[in-house]
Amino acid sequence: MTVKTETAAGASTLTYSKMRGMVALLIAFMKQRRMGLNDFIQKIATNSSYACKPSEVQSILNISPPQEPELLNENSSPPPSPSQQINLGPSSNPHAKPSDFQFLKIIGKGSFGKVLLARHQADEKFYAVKVLQKKAILKKKEEKHIMSERNVLLKNVKHPFLVGLHFSFQTTSRLYFILDYINGGELFYHLQRERCFLEPRARFYAAEIASALGYLHSLNIVYRDLKPENILLDSQGHIVLTDFGLCKENIEPNGTTSTFCGTPEYLAPEVLHKQPYDRTVDWWCLGAVLYEMLYGLPPFYSRNTAEMYDNILNKPLQLKPNITNSARNLLEGLLQKDRTKRIGAKNDFMEIKNHIFFSPINWDDLINKKITPPFNPNVSGPSDLQHFDPEFTEEPVPNSIGQSPDSILITASIKEAAEAFMGFSYAPPMESYL
């Protein structure tokens, strides 16, 4: 079977075998994207078939799972059970409990739990509820990251392109984040369907993403995990960033950090080199996402992860001629391997904002959502789940998620020396409910 396709250069022949190869490439790409970075790297590192790879790349692959110094448990004894470790103290929202909600559908999954569509029994509003298993968090010593995510969420209420936290609470076994419900679908989902976007649409999304990143940077927060899976579209088509588990707080304008974390396709060269890095890693990721929106795959993508890492470190950026000069210039600046020469290295978001590629954007109108999005997800209401993966929505909701007998609710009377999730529960000031 042969298919004829017309291109700017004329007619070309696309064989069936080539089509199968392209499909296989995309399927492999999507599967790898769903795998956790640590687990994936460990699988690669222990695979003898990579023994002959360049030493530079091999040194990257042969690492143990990264941990921040502050995440290391100084006490070598087994951790207490979750119920013993928690102390809510003077909880701001002592009355919130799982049975306040009707849990309707599973709409996502992560390393430590699920995200569910839920309706509050009292006000009948819809929320996305992120439910995390304490046991899994404590086992991997990720409690500081979870608390960091909560802290970042509390600061998001002032920005239109960051998902907001309404309140949080916990039981002996689970943590509950009550978040904005966003049902326009992941950017990843829409890229899967459409392969790539026209430049005006990509510019609109990149501008809203850059605005959100700039706001986080103004709070001395580095996002570190920008990728299409973490970028949602709301019901009107505006961008909403979510998943702040890898955010790093307290990074001053000239400050650095060194934790090896992120998603393979979007790791900046300095992260792969295991060098100290700064907030410019977010601008590298913005460049990678913009490239993917325009071309359909990340800039240095390969099915072979070792080869992809080598590409990120050493291969020159290749740009096809079907984009404008301003887009080309921005991509070259964002995907600059030397972070000191990267766009954003000197004046952070202001450099991105003032780039000629964004000259059609009125930034005041953008932040006030006065610009009509180039794409409308056309959702009929909160119960419209057309943009969620059926793999999630068709799974039954566990009954235990919505159960909250008095005996398992954490109260302020529980006091232990090791307080892993102290202060997790949160409720906004009373006037926020009015």
Curated annotation (Swiss-Prot):
The keyword Zinc-finger does not apply. Disulfide bonds: none annotated. Residues 359-434 form the AGC-kinase C-terminal domain. Residues 101-358 form the Protein kinase domain. Keywords: Apoptosis, ATP-binding, Cytoplasm, Endoplasmic reticulum, Kinase, Nucleotide-binding, Nucleus, Phosphoprotein, Serine/threonine-protein kinase, Stress response, Transferase. It catalyses: L-seryl-[protein] + ATP = O-phospho-L-seryl-[protein] + ADP + H(+); L-threonyl-[protein] + ATP = O-phospho-L-threonyl-[protein] + ADP + H(+). PROSITE patterns: AGC_KINASE_CTER, PROTEIN_KINASE_ATP, PROTEIN_KINASE_DOM, PROTEIN_KINASE_ST. It is found in: Cytoplasm; Nucleus; Endoplasmic reticulum. One of its GO terms (cellular component) is cytoplasm. Its EC number is 2.7.11.1. Induction: Up-regulated by aldosterone and glucocorticoids. SMART domains: S_TK_X, S_TKc. The keyword Heme does not apply. InterPro entries: AGC-kinase_C, Kinase-like_dom_sf, Pkinase_C, Prot_kinase_dom, Protein_kinase_ATP_BS, Ser/Thr_kinase_AS. PANTHER family: RIBOSOMAL PROTEIN S6 KINASE. Belongs to the protein kinase superfamily. AGC Ser/Thr protein kinase family. This is Serine/threonine-protein kinase Sgk1-A. It comes from Xenopus laevis (African clawed frog).
